[in-house]
């Protein structure tokens, strides 16, 4: 997927930016005036993405600030009102889940119940946006220096975590997940997930790559850069997955052993066996013995005995915010000197998030500062300030009690279809509208390198077909599943339940997708109409 | 005769203390879980100590200062180790109310635990909830302090950058016109007059050549 899809598309975007020397709107307008809608669509997608993405930085800041306590606040459950036991919700779920759902998000039972804006996340969101503003304030002059830091620190922390992770008890169980299951490779869903992952991790279609490339020297060898960047991207992904899997194995082993201990305790207490008699090794035989000797009592106790299995613990695949804030914190609280590991981890998360925000911010600002209309009225600092302020104001939605549900909604639906469509139109535009031969000669004039046949084939045929395939798959998936659903936290039961989206949420989803995809045809139509009228005017004047 | 009396006393004891008796509490110890290799064996001497600790706790209750070790009865001792106990009044006729026993045990829980090197989890009194220590709450939550520090640093940095940007722009506006921003992508547009850039014609560094006529003298005065 990397070779077939990632590298060609990355090279294409870098080359377009370097050649046109403008942000996304201007670049596509130069290729063809009908296609400036592509640039606008990129801008809209980047804007929507930046609105919801900074909320992750908010949460990272929140956890970072809370890591300076002993013990860590998510490692112990708070007491209930009369101090006789632990809080009920915390008992049913785990302390890390409780801290995430109750203390951080204060989540409501469903997306309809909005609740009010909560001041603690709102403060952290404001701070997060101030930090982003600080980084993109001066444009690429400052972002270049910031990015040196935000890119190198995560590697440093990952190496530390790699060493720590591999030495944890039970880490090898998680690393066993690395062996690819051959039958999964035959499943087309796996390939589709791989294609989507490459697509979004490289940031294609957001306009950020074009914006950054437009600041390059014209003679810059963007082919070499495209290759290096995509290879490093994938290597980093594999590297961080080693760390993740070892931490995962540690957590799964820990939970499995806890589960076994609970079963042992339950049996010891119910049958008044000698303390320490039941161990992990003789558990099964003793269970059978008890079942045969005291059948009545055993059948009473049996419903409470959970079947502990290491495989099921490992199989609970989590991704996204669940992985970062629940699974990792659970693993961290069991390590020694957990405050240090926690601070390191959330600082790394913060720098990664800031790096992404800087990229998205540049993708938004470059077209705005390039356009003569806006930049003649306002200086660069004011434009970035206004954009940050607007984003922060809209982002307050995500600090409400139902905010996490809206976040998931934005996360799942903002970028998927729109980016696929944008990149498809980009590839077709460069190859067929602008002309592959013309682009090739432009590149040769700029960089002095000839375009090899591999890139030509990829750009003209393979990548567009692949994207069309992905697009069709996602559309059919959405249509076939009927109503879209989301995961809601049930405080009374202590785990997530699936609920349907209400109609207005579905309307918002439709609006999100439409606002970016409709730009392309609408602007094309608009340009056509205005041109048509201009030509008519010229004819009638003559 | 003596045998009959002994039999009577044991029967009364058996009636007072049995599983789920009125005012009886079940106790459960997990010695090996708590102490591992250093675990001691639970024998009659340990039971004696337990009865002594319960009697000690009851003596702290007003009106019960006369409680003796013999008034604490244990029964149904299992290998777990678990057993039931009751506290009787001095006449050994009835058991003391559960509420009194419960409050006495709760008040002295730490002493009882430490006598056996155990804690609330490994020495359990079923139906007597233990009072958990509340977590330490500092007066100002720590996170607000850290937040405040970082917030101030970021605001100051932004203010500095914005001010320096404004100052630089003001200096540029006063300086030679036509020179654009440093990080511009296009080449600097330098106003050109007859192929000679205007900048070097600035009088700042050069000497005035008096051979040339100044502006006023070109037109000879009348």
Swiss-Prot record, chain B:
Glycans are attached at residues 76, 93. PROSITE patterns: COLLECTRIN_LIKE. InterPro entries: Collectrin, Collectrin_dom. Glycosylated. Glycosylation is required for plasma membrane localization and for its cleavage by BACE2. Residues 15-141 are extracellular. It is found in: Cell membrane. Residues 163-222 are cytoplasmic. It comes from the Eukaryota. Expressed on the apical surface of the proximal tubules in the renal cortex (at protein level). Kidney; collecting ducts and proximal tubule. Pancreas; beta cells of islets. Expressed in the cerebral cortex, hippocampus, brainstem and cerebellum. The record marks 125-126 as: Cleavage by BACE2. Disulfide bonds: none annotated. The keyword Zinc does not apply. Residues 1-14 form the signal peptide. Disruption phenotype: Deficient mice are viable and fertile but exhibit a severe defect in renal amino acid uptake due to down-regulation of apical amino acid transporters in the kidney. Greater urine output, more dilute urine, a defect in urinary concentration, higher osmolar clearance and an increase in free water absorption, suggesting an osmotic diuresis. Decreased urine osmolytes sodium and urea, presence of tyrosine and glutamine crystals in the urine, and increased excretion of amino acids in the urine, suggesting an aminoaciduria. Pfam families: Collectrin. The chain crosses the membrane at residues 142-162. Induction: Up-regulated by high glucose concentration in beta-cells (at protein level). Belongs to the CLTRN family. Monomer. Homodimer. Homodimer; dimerization prevents CLTRN cleavage by BACE2. Interacts with SNAPIN. Interacts with SLC6A18; this interaction regulates the trafficking of SLC6A18 to the cell membrane and its amino acid transporter activity. Interacts with SLC6A19; this interaction regulates the trafficking of SLC6A19 to the cell membrane and its amino acid transporter activity. Interacts with SLC6A20B. PANTHER family: COLLECTRIN (PTHR46884:SF1). Plays an important role in amino acid transport by acting as binding partner of amino acid transporters SLC6A18 and SLC6A19, regulating their trafficking on the cell surface and their activity. May also play a role in trafficking of amino acid transporters SLC3A1 and SLC7A9 to the renal cortical cell membrane. Regulator of SNARE complex function. Stimulator of beta cell replication. The cleavage site containing the double Phe-Phe motif acts as negative regulator of shedding by BACE2. This is Collectrin. It comes from Mus musculus (Mouse).
